[in-house]
Regions:
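Outer-membrane beta-barrel porins/channels
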Residues: 1-233
Length: 233
């Protein structure tokens, strides 16, 4: 299987603190993996089952980053503000995760089928850490480590030191999702379906770079077939 990946990031606003103003452009890169599957069916009862696996796919994106921030001196004698600036090309390694899909369908009565889809994606451990971004985080952490252990500086020191080894994007849990529903053919021209879905999320906090943390959904579909060779859904 062939996959393309690219990205553009611009961090703006007070929520990003010292990293606001960071920009990155990651050029398109293509990668290949492999796909394998099994399928089984019993036409008499409209039973269909399939199981597919997709491997990890590795990418190395040519990147250009703009880091322009200042590590403050916090008014401490001998601790001067430090300018972090970089506008440099580099490489960003990204590995998209392996996944498994299970699809089931079976007739439950005349002109009616039940269906189920279960999907697993191994997002646990996924991370994107562009070179200059990572170096900026580590320098901010170093500035935090250099702060004296004063009670008034404890929150700032803890915040800065927590940035060491950080990533632009990271997930720490496997993702599970499932959809179950029923479809029915009402007559020769009309059919419909209803479904309910659930997604566990990947353990990431909700941010502008990871806007959801799991969800439920409800779906309703209608299909109209004016002629045997085409339909409108």
């Amino acid at each position: 299987v062939y996959q393309e990946a690219k990205g553009n990031v611009s961090l703006r606003g007070t929520a990003y603190g010292l990293l606001t103003g960071y920009d990155a452009t990651m050029k398109k890169d293509g990668g290949t993996g492999w796909l394998a599957g099994l399928a089984y069916q019993i036409p008499e009862i409209a039973l269909k089952a399939s199981l597919t696996y997709r491997s990890e796919i590795e990418h190395q994106l040519a990147s250009r980053e703009n880091v322009n921030t200042v590590v403050p001196g916090f008014g401490i004698p001998g601790v001067l503000p430090t300018q972090l600036f970089a506008y440099a090309p580099g490489k960003t390694d990204v590995t998209t995760p392996q996944s498994v899909n299970l699809d089931l369908q079976s007739g439950i009565m005349a002109d009616t089928v039940a269906f189920l889809n279960v999907r697993w994606v191994n997002w646990d451990g996924f991370a994107i850490r562009p070179t200059q971004f990572g170096q900026a985080l580590d320098q901010l952490a170093a500035a935090g480590n250099a702060l004296p252990a004063l009670p008034a500086l404890a929150p700032t020191k803890a915040l800065l030191t927590s940035l060491e080894g950080g990533n632009l994007v990271e997930y720490n849990e496997e993702q599970w999702s499932a959809t179950v529903g029923v479809g029915r053919k009402f007559n020769a021209k009309w059919a419909g379906n209803v479904s309910v879905g659930w997604d566990s999320g990947a353990g990431n906090p909700v941010t502008t770079l990871g806007p959801t943390e799991g969800y439920w959904n409800v779906g309703v579909g209608v299909q109209f077939s004016p002629a045997p060779n085409y339909f409108i859904a």
